[in-house]
Amino acid sequence: MNTDLLVTTTEHIPGKEYEVIGEVFGLTTQSKNVLRNMGAALKNVVGGEIKDYTKMLDEARNISVDRLRKNARDMGADAVVMMRFDSGSIGTDMQSVAAYGTAVKYV
């Protein structure tokens, strides 16, 4: 994970003045293989955490933030403020995660 560009969920960066460049996104869609899906279906019957899907979502969030950073850097940004996540299912075995925020340039 590349962390050289600040990404924060806050609106302000203490001690920094900046101008807004624009909105920025990082997206990914992940899926599990058929065998893992069968294991998840069995776990769904008995209840409890489906660790493979938890791991997949964690990886998807990390990938989406990495892509957000790259896209912000490509826009000439120094940081991203007001970062948020959105996620949703595609079919029964895919998950899409978006990291989005406002790209800013220090003045």
Swiss-Prot record:
Superkingdom of this protein's organism? Bacteria
Note the InterPro entries from the entry.
UPF0145_dom_sf, UPF0145_YbjQ-like
Family recorded in the similarity comment: Belongs to the UPF0145 family.
For this entry, the protein name equals UPF0145 protein LVIS_1527
Instruction: Record the organism.
Output: Levilactobacillus brevis (strain ATCC 367 / BCRC 12310 / CIP 105137 / JCM 1170 / LMG 11437 / NCIMB 947 / NCTC 947)
Q: What is the lineage of its organism?
A: Bacteria, Bacillati, Bacillota, Bacilli, Lactobacillales
